[in-house]
Amino acid sequence: MSIRSFAHRILRRALPGFVRRSYLAKFGVALLAVVVCISAAGGVMYLNTSEHLQQSSRTELKKAAELSSSAVDNWHDERTNNARMLAQYGVFDNDNATEVQQFFTDEQHHLPSDVRDIHYVSLTDARVITSTDAGLRNASFGSEAAPWSRQQLTPGDDGVFVSQPYVNDGITEVAYVARVSSTPGRRTAVVMTASLAAISSSFWDPTPHSFTQLVDGTGSVIADDSKRATRQPYVENATSPIVGARAVGFQPAAQAAKEMDQAHETAYAPVDGTPWVVTLHVPTSEAYGLASNMAENVLLILGIALAGLVFIALTLGRGTVRALNDLEAKAAALERGEYDTDLDVARVDELGRLFEAFASLRDTVQARIRDANEQQVDAEAARSEAEAAQADAEAAQAEAEAAREESEAQARRLETTAEAFSETMRAYAAGDLTVRLDADVEQAAMADIAAAFNEMAADMEATIADVVAFADEVATASTDASDSAAAVEQTGRDVSDAVGRIRDRAADQRDQLEAVASETDEMSATIEEVAASADQVAETSQRAAALGDDGQAAAQDAVAQLEEIEDETQAAATAVDDLEAKMSEIETIVAAITDIAEQTNMLALNANIEAARADQDGDGFAVVADEVKDLADESKASAAEIEALVAEVRAQTETSVAAMDRIQERVSDGVETVSETERSLSEIAGRIAEADTGVQEISNAMDDQAASVSDVTTAVGDVAALGEETATEAESTADAAAEQATTLSDVAAQTETLAEHAVALREHAAQFEVAADNEPGA
């Protein structure tokens, strides 16, 4: 016993009698079972697949909003650090507006392009000291050109105040205010303005028609994909729960704004440290496009399968059953002897030819009956004539009896053939499509009926075989879909593995960032030690500058004293020169006295001569002459002594003059040398002062660098924390990928279920017995 025969017997026992007796009932029950199975499997698969894919789409949209929020947070932190570092430079120590302006101009070339202007402001005087914007220099707060100045500029705990976004020249900006700590006694700050339009380049839009907006705490749009946001009201209005949200969320299309031209799904994520929220709007048709496409494909497959079954039921099933019922009824009428039954039909297929064969059979039976009746009439006539001719009557009677018996035998054979045909047709109507009428009969009409019926049965058997083949094709397609789902499942698992590797790499990056943070801490400690050494050098430089100033003062005192000595030496030299002049005058006088003495001697000699001439009368005159001579001799001797003394004094005076000249020259040289020394000391003092200023700037720079390195250390710590968050998000993404792989496994399982239902369809169709050569694959 074959498996098919065993299954057929089981089905016959399980099905009610009216179903087993009716081909239409069997066909309807089989189709209904297949429709119910396919519909149930398709509905479950549609609902599960749609729900899982929609949940996955929502998760991806929230991830996209978080990525955009993280990018805005990084941009905001970078601009905050830019403003803080600008305020820590030493250029503000001298409070020189020109130097600060030049510094701002140079620094602006190194800052990001979205930094529009840098201002140096006095919070005490409420005015702009200098700025890269020439129109704001020396301007007071509250200017239309400086909307940020109309806000309360109060730096927060991190030393930087962030203004509310404002519109300036059609561009939405935000100002970062950092307090300058190197101007004691004055409250000054650096104000850096940045355009929020640059943020839009970091927005992540997952679909072609999605758009992203950055909304502040007042419900105004401060940045969007168009880069033209000017604080227009948020599309969902300021009372939306999205405005001011503090956690990542999702808003379905049912709650989206009525102002949009179509339904949108909205994902949002707050920006840490700000009242800003990133909102991602995606059309519902794009957000769930994959889910809709897959659901439509599933429904399309189910629709095609159901439409095919309905088409088969309406075309083949109902028409065939109706024709068989009519044929059965008319065959029963013929069996009852109702030979006037109408067997004309409009069909031209096998069933139509079967009706024609039954009509031919009816006509043949009627002709035979007429022949039998005519033979019976002839027999009666012959029996009447037998009275006239005994010998001929007996022969005729015997012949008539034989003819009658032959006619009755033919009628019995025809009745037997009709009963066999009727039994075979009942078996065929019960579902056994393998039965055939015996065409090898002596009646030509019955042979034609058998041939037509057998042709119709063969076509019906082929039709049922086609139904079985269709079920096989559905099973094969379901198997292929199952294989495709398995391939997609494997792809999902590959994606899950790739995300796992990304998670591992994110963990490695987190470890590297922690190592960098540790190295940065060590570098910060080293720079603080260098800053301490720079402070010691600055103190030494200040002491050297003080000693240089003392040396310069001492040199200046020495120059003053040498100049006084030079003046006194000059005065002494002048006095010696005057003495020398007086000595020259004395020499002149001594020369005159000597001349007078010589003349006096000459007079005395002349007097003695005259006295000698006068003899005794000239004694008195001689005495006088002697006295005069003696006096002249004494005067000459005194003049000689004076001359000798004057010569000695002159020689000493010349020596003194030469010495004074040499002293004056040396004093002059000393004054020049000391002056050069004083100039050198002055230059040295200036250089020491400059060096001290440089050392002080180096010390301040080292302090600033230490602070900057501390900020960098903090930033590296933040990056390390971000790496930790990235690793965590990678793990979450890996879990989501694993969940998606599980979902695909469910889809594969449901596809296998569809294949099983297709097999069930084939089994239902297999309850109709067909020949082995008509089976699929035969």
Curated annotation (Swiss-Prot):
Methylated by CheR. The chain crosses the membrane at residues 27-47, 297-317. Residues 376-411 are annotated as: Disordered. Its main location: membrane. The keyword Repeat applies. Residues 387-400 have a biased composition (Low complexity). Belongs to the methyl-accepting chemotaxis (MCP) protein family. Potentially involved in chemo- or phototactic signal transduction. This is Transducer protein Htr4. It comes from Halobacterium salinarum (strain ATCC 700922 / JCM 11081 / NRC-1) (Halobacterium halobium). The lineage of its organism: Archaea, Methanobacteriati, Methanobacteriota, Stenosarchaea group, Halobacteria.
